[in-house]
Amino acid sequence: MAIEQIIEEVLPYLTKWYTILFGAAVTYFLSIALRNKFYEYKLKCENPVYFEDAGLFGIPALIDIIKVRKAGQLADYTDTTFDKYPNLSSYMTVAGVLKIVFTVDPENIKAVLATQFNDFALGARHAHFDPLLGDGIFTLDGEGWKLSRAMLRPQFAREQIAHVKALEPHVQILAKQIKLNKGKTFDLQELFFRFTVDTATEFLFGESVHSLYDEKLGIPAPNDIPGRENFAEAFNTSQHYLATRTYSQIFYWLTNPKEFRDCNAKVHKLAQYFVNTALNATEKEVEEKSKGGYVFLYELVKQTRDPKVLQDQLLNIMVAGRDTTAGLLSFAMFELARNPKIWNKLREEVEVNFGLGDEARVDEISFETLKKCEYLKAVLNETLRMYPSVPINFRTATRDTTLPRGGGKDGNSPIFVPKGSSVVYSVYKTHRLKQFYGEDAYEFRPERWFEPSTRKLGWAYLPFNGGPRICLGQQFALTEASYVIARLAQMFEHLESKDETYPPNKCIHLTMNHNEGVFISAK
């Protein structure tokens, strides 16, 4: 067949739109690949090992992630993926055409969060979270984030977080709920989530939703505020959907069911009620409210009168202030119920400092005196090590950049990270690395925090993130958790775990908690 005849037969197909589109796509991706290779060579970088189970466009891996997350095993799944590469701390995978570097190396995490902070951003997080949280400190990048942080930082000054006395009325109701189940098996986590939504709404709005109140206590929940009665449940459901949107990455828009939209509306309704109340208050009423005790919203109103800014920032802080503390308390009590020796040792420390039972000196528990409880601090450190509030996080490269380690077969070369690529980092796994925590890294042992090896961990211990975006409310959460555990130690001598699964299945929404609840008995 003559060459002219071949050209004559093939030419019509070459001019078809789909052929042109295919050729353009191939050319585009080939040019990107060649460009990346050039920069890898220029910057003396090497690719990390490719995750062999990712499959075509990462779709099989994404399906696996959805399955294990539903089963409460996502954190442990990401942990075990590194078992395939025992000498490496990073690997590469893909989601569609998106390149993803997965790392547990403290040096890489430090680069992403601190030393190369301006090379990375939240990426699509704003789109993922926007339906519930809007434009707040956890969803914004750049100038918007800087303005949010400047606005919120004063609200977490020492005098605010030191005011533990406001917690006591809520602790009393929590204790009554526990005593209702004396000698019985009950879900303590469910009570902690109700407790922290009560304390968080009082701190933020100036009035608690009192979700711990119920008919069993003879204290019916008040129903005088629109949306109060179903706020906590709606907030939980909305966060579940936000997490699904996050793990769906570029397919987040597929998660937008009616239930999600309805729950968002319920949450917004309550927040808007409090915002409007604050905005309609006179200057004198605002000052009077502030004198009665610190109220986050009324302090914020002194800085801005924009109702959307107020609503969005309140809900952003609600996520952190409520869920991280509830998760920390739940995991701490889960381990304490499993380890009676640790519980007894903790109670001995509380007895020395504040007394127990009928001899409890509750008035002596303060921000300052809680600092004396070194073993309590070690228990919380160990809880946050094994169960960090945000076990897995990610950032997106805003420009072509590098990570210091993880490339090549030995994992010691820099990694080239093209603009638009994601870096996923697992603090959950980093906190279990034996080179930092020893052979018993998977065991709950508070005593490790009195050993020299844990005094120079640096970026290998990161319970509250790090760098410019380090958690503003970390001391607030630690103070609240310390107070609650100290009070429970005063009131309950014996704890017994009723959970048979260990390690526990973990539910990861925006933060982490027990997938099935924390079932114990207490007396």
From Swiss-Prot:
EC number(s) per entry: 1.14.14.-
One Pfam family of this chain: p450
Signal peptide residue numbers: none
Keyword line: Heme, Iron, Membrane, Metal-binding, Monooxygenase, Oxidoreductase, Transmembrane, Transmembrane helix
Main location per the UniProt record: membrane
Cofactor needs: heme
Residues where heme binds: 471
Cellular localization per UniProt: Membrane
InterPro entries attached to this UniProt entry: Cyt_P450 (IPR001128), Cyt_P450_CS (IPR017972), Cyt_P450_E_CYP52_ascomycetes (IPR002974), Cyt_P450_E_CYP52_fungi (IPR047146), Cyt_P450_E_grp-II (IPR002402), Cyt_P450_sf (IPR036396)
Membrane-related topology note: Single-pass membrane protein
Bilayer-crossing regions: 17-34
Induction context: By alkanes.
Main EC class the enzyme belongs to: oxidoreductase
GO molecular-function terms, A-Z: heme binding; iron ion binding; oxidoreductase activity, acting on paired donors, with incorporation or reduction of molecular oxygen, reduced flavin or flavoprotein as one donor, and incorporation of one atom of oxygen
Entry-linked CDD domains: CYP52
Keyword field contains Transcription: no
GO cellular component, one term: membrane
Protein family: Belongs to the cytochrome P450 family.
Role summary: Together with an NADPH cytochrome P450 the enzyme system catalyzes the terminal hydroxylation as the first step in the assimilation of alkanes and fatty acids.
Protein name (record): Cytochrome P450 52A3-A
Name of the gene this protein is made from: CYP52A3-A
